[in-house]
Amino acid sequence: MSEELQQKLRSQLWTVANTLRGNMSASDFMYFTLGFIFYKYLSEKIELYANEILEEDHITFKEVWNGKDEELKQDVKEECIQNLGYFIEPEYLYSTIIELISKKENILPSLERSLKKIEDSTIGQDSEDDFGGLFSDLDLASPKLGKTADDKNKLISDVLIALNGIDFGLQEAGDIDILGDAYEYMISQFAAGAGKKAGEFYTPQEVSQILAEIVITGKVRLKDVFDPTCGSGSLLLRTAKSGKADSIFGQEKNCLLYTSPSPRDMRRS
């Protein structure tokens, strides 16, 4: 990712975060912002993938779901779950929620169903543990979002609209790098405002680099790297990269951080 694109992405992300900043603490709006970023990513990822596998049939993902070919729907769903680990029907996509916003509708019930549907799609699958409780920290009924239902709806709608203008480069080979950079940048910014509490989910890059250098001192290559409280995974991955580790292991009780791009990459290693 070019430095220009990186700076543009970070500027857009921080603009989104500022929409929530006045309503809640840094750690609270971190969970909302990162949760919605990941929802957008998952939605765009699956729509792109589904359209690609349907290309030879000259039909789009949304067109299939508007049709009556139940066998084709099931085939698409199974292939998505097998290769992506989850499934989202078109009516629960991020883009569909944006359409509801444009119609001035109350999106909160639909948004809540959409987030739950993503988790439910993995039940009984190998990816169930990865997605279980993914959006559990997104309390759309929280009084921190506003006093009335209309206030909450407007605030969340504003955040989703702002995020909608962000391009995560899904059609590029480095899409995970772009999303991972977005996560690390946002977490670092939230950490700056969270004070001492930030230590539970983020280790500053400078500290991570020093710790990584200490760990690999006198070693040419690391066999395994393990972090029992890996948070967002930034320290673990930095150490693994510096030490050219063969395997990476981490534990994290916070669902949102556990399922962020860094730990997901970590589990694939």
Could you say what each language-model-derived stretch is?
Residues 1-215:
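Non-catalytic, mostly N-terminal accessory regions of nucleic-acid modification and defense proteins
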Residues 34, 143-145, 233, 252, ...:
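A ubiquitous, low-specificity "background" feature that marks scattered single residues
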Residues 197-261:
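Conserved S-adenosyl-L-methionine
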Residues 262-265, 269:
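Positively charged, low-complexity/disordered segments
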